[in-house]
Amino acid sequence: MPLHMMASQIFPAIANKQYALGMSEKGSPLFYMAWANFDDAAEAEYLTNYNLALTPHNWNGGDRPWILFFAAPFGGAYEGERWIKENLFKDSPEVRFLYHEGKKRGKRILCKRGKNVSAMASLKWHNENMPLVAAPMQLEKDVASLLG
């Protein structure tokens, strides 16, 4: 994320209490993440221009959770993903995020489900709440997440 985007992406997440800072048992930072709960219109707008400044309504206006920012510079990506599925979004049928190497491999939406949601319930929700994408984008449902 460019530095000039911090004011529109990171600070509102903190103000809305939609961020997490994961720490190791020794007190070292493992990961930082921020999320929003989009409605379908905000989701479509985000997918059209994911560097846009979100309005206050966009941060918590719907039931489509999106990880907007995730950084694990010291190797805490696995712990962060596990924490997301087991704690933060444990009851969510799906949480979405953009693949971090989209410029190299093409835009992709990755999807995970919370640990308390069955694979069938997640798949049903996914099929009923497909992202409205105008630009070509690949949608990847995490098969491993669905199966276990």
How would you name each of these model-derived features?
Residues 104-148:
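Intrinsically disordered, low-complexity terminal/linker regions enriched in Pro/Ser/Gly
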Residues 1-54, 129-148:
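Non-catalytic substrate-recognition and accessory regions of acyl/acetyltransferase enzymes
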Residues 41-120:
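Acyl-donor binding region in acyl/amide transferases
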